[in-house]
Curated annotation (Swiss-Prot):
Pathway: Aromatic compound metabolism; 3-phenylpropanoate degradation. Homodimer. The lineage of its organism: Bacteria, Pseudomonadati, Pseudomonadota, Betaproteobacteria, Rhodocyclales. Keywords: Aromatic hydrocarbons catabolism, Hydrolase. The active site is at 269 (proton acceptor). SUPFAM superfamilies: alpha/beta-Hydrolases. This is 2-hydroxy-6-oxononadienedioate/2-hydroxy-6-oxononatrienedioate hydrolase 1. GO terms for cellular component: cytoplasm.
Length: 289
């Protein structure tokens, strides 16, 4: 085991910060890895039990080894960050939380990697703070709006919402089975870790259900504003994504003037995990050229 991997554990990189951003007054949890001149922020998705570390633990070490500082934010209402009921745009809430975090820890311009909800939130942040974004990497998210090919809500989103309402191991396995292309890659250890994270914060689960009842459309459709996002963007999608259909990725590259698209074959909604090695090489190449 390398010295880098020995120090890059969730516990060793775990930190908390209090943010005050407008009417937000929250304690956020984040993981702070490496010490490079440039910083990459990673934003996780909206699944029950999600966290920055759970989403991106296969992607941190290559970035740190390449000389980047990596910050993984637990969004408000997930993992070790404070609970919240969101009655408005979840994307904008997370963008404001990210601004508060960056201000609190003294970071100005960052690159952002966002998966699913994290992609939506990254676009929201780029629209509100264009001068603070270097490059964007968006996977399985980035804008709302209906699919032209798949009935909405999608199969995956229905299972996700069902898991929030009834957080059982059986419902977790049903959701995870459509989360990735090859469900044989999912281990009992992974299921248990996700279940433990979910059940350790029942308040987060209950608040997500309350948020949906108040505002069923938690994620803003940024389609009409994508032309304002001028940062270089790498859009990555799984051909077999059953949560956010592939044509959402096409919307992003049609709308954002400096975006390019890569589609992974035999890949679901978790490209950074399902194709970690290829994903890591692609991201490093994009960030450095």
């Amino acid at each position: 085991m390398s010295t880098t991997s020995q120090t890059l554990t969730e516990a060793a990189t775990s930190k908390f910060v209090r943010i005050k951003e407008g009417d937000l007054d929250l304690q956020l949890h984040y993981n702070d890895c490496g010490s490079g001149v440039e910083t990459v922020v990673m934003l996780h998705g909206s699944g029950p039990g999600a966290s920055g570390w759970a989403n991106f633990n296969r992607n941190v070490e290559p970035l740190v080894a390449a000389g980047y500082r990596v910050v993984l934010m637990d969004c408000p209402g997930w993992s070790k960050s404070d609970p919240i009921v969101c009655s408005g745009s979840r994307s904008e809430l997370n963008a404001r939380a990210l601004k508060g975090l960056l201000d609190a820890i003294g970071l100005d311009k960052v690159h952002i990697i966002g998966n699913s909800m994290g992609g939506h939130s990254a676009v929201a942040f780029a629209l509100a703070n264009p001068s603070r974004v270097g490059k964007l990497i968006l996977m399985g998210g980035g804008t709302g709006g209906p699919s032209q090919f798949v009935p909405m809500p999608t199969e995956g989103i229905k299972l996700l919402q069902g898991l929030y309402r009834e957080p059982t191991i059986d419902n977790l396995k049903k959701m995870m089975a459509v989360f990735v292309f090859d469900s044989s890659s999912l281990t009992e250890e992974l299921y248990q870790a996700r279940l433990d994270n979910m059940m350790s914060r029942r308040d987060h689960l209950e608040n997500f259900v309350k948020s949906l009842a108040i505002n069923p459309k938690q994620f803003t459709d940024y389609g009409p504003r994508l032309g304002e996002v001028t940062a270089p963007a790498l859009v990555i999608w799984g051909r077999d994504d059953r949560f956010v259909p592939m044509d959402a990725g096409l919307r992003l590259i049609w709308g954002m003037p400096n975006a390019e698209l890569h589609i992974f074959n035999r890949c679901g909604h978790w490209a950074q995990w399902e194709h970690a090695d290829k994903f890591n090489r692609m991201v490093l190449d994009f960030l450095t050229h």
